[in-house]
Amino acid sequence: GTGGLTRLVDKRLVRRDVADLFCTKAEGFRARDAVKYTLVDDSFPRSKWDEKIAEVSAASAAKAQRGDVGIPLPPVVSEVSDDGALRTYKYVELSLNADDRVATITIHAPKSPPPADAAALRAEGADTWVFRAFREFDNALLHLRFNHAEFGLITIRTQGDAAAVLAHDGALDALATDWLATEIRLFQARTLRRVDNTARSIFTVVDHGSCFVGSLFELVIAADRSFMLEDDDGEVTVQVSSASAGRLPMSTGITRLQARFMRDSSQIDAALASDGPLDAPQAFDLGLVTLAPDEIDWDDEIRIAIEERVSLSPDALTGIEQNLRFVGAENCDSKIFGRLSAWQNWIFQRPNAVGDEGALTLYGHPTRPKFDWNRT
């Protein structure tokens, strides 16, 4: 398939004419030619197979040897309400509104101080907020993906002390050379990339008590739309930090600020240079949020936007989202998991497009198409 073709030339960097030959050569390549043309890394005779594989494995393990003991990763657990509509983790809540096909994920700020050093980070292990909150968030996204395909919209909220979030982010940054801190940062980045590659509409809602700062601010600019309340006292704020400057990259290798402000890089500089909390007018002027309604219009703006979104074809939304989220040059990851998966492997094969009652079949007819609301 096209995913395999992309991996040939973009991942293994096989010469394009050799890849063309390989893809059309019915009998394939023997081992010697496969190695020559870099289709495989090496080839061993059966008599030496076990010995050579052990050597390769040992060499690979030696490259990653840190001399440190890992930390236990207990299962991510949650409590589920009797009706299944609420799933509660330690730092995350997942609420399901089946009637509207809308899921709400709320991430809570930490209530304890951050680890003071590498030893304290190891002592907290998988329970430290910067790791556990993101594991729970990741688990909630996967739960929606595999168990609730009919939910087309995810609204993301946060609650808690913004200063506590920044303190925990700062503690992780201070341990830049520590292997565990590095692995946690990499996991955070992977989780945020899962948001980018989630085939659901994503709205971020910034209102009273929100703590979209530091690493959590990435969820504001990862969303398809963001709504920020313009309150009279200016207490609703967001804050950009060094977390948005490169340590949490997208699949394409650029930051979400770069993807957002591809036309004018000076806006990236302005966002990163913003000092401290930003209220709704300031965030809107910097282009960091989509809409900033006041308290009079807030409820109606959110309601109308949600009702409008869930009424649209889920396949059309998947196509729109996967094209608009990944701005700029493609790479192997974004080709396979972005537009390619959305369009070729999903949209154009679905009854919503080509079925008897699909949108393409009924285009130009007075009859409205009937959609299967399930998402990938």
List where the protein language model places each region:
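CoA-thioester-processing core
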Residues: 1-19, 213-270
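C-terminal alpha-helix plus adjacent terminal tail
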Residues: 13-36, 42-219, 226-235, 270-285, ...
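Conserved phosphoryl-transfer motifs of two-component systems
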Residues: 41-42, 290-291
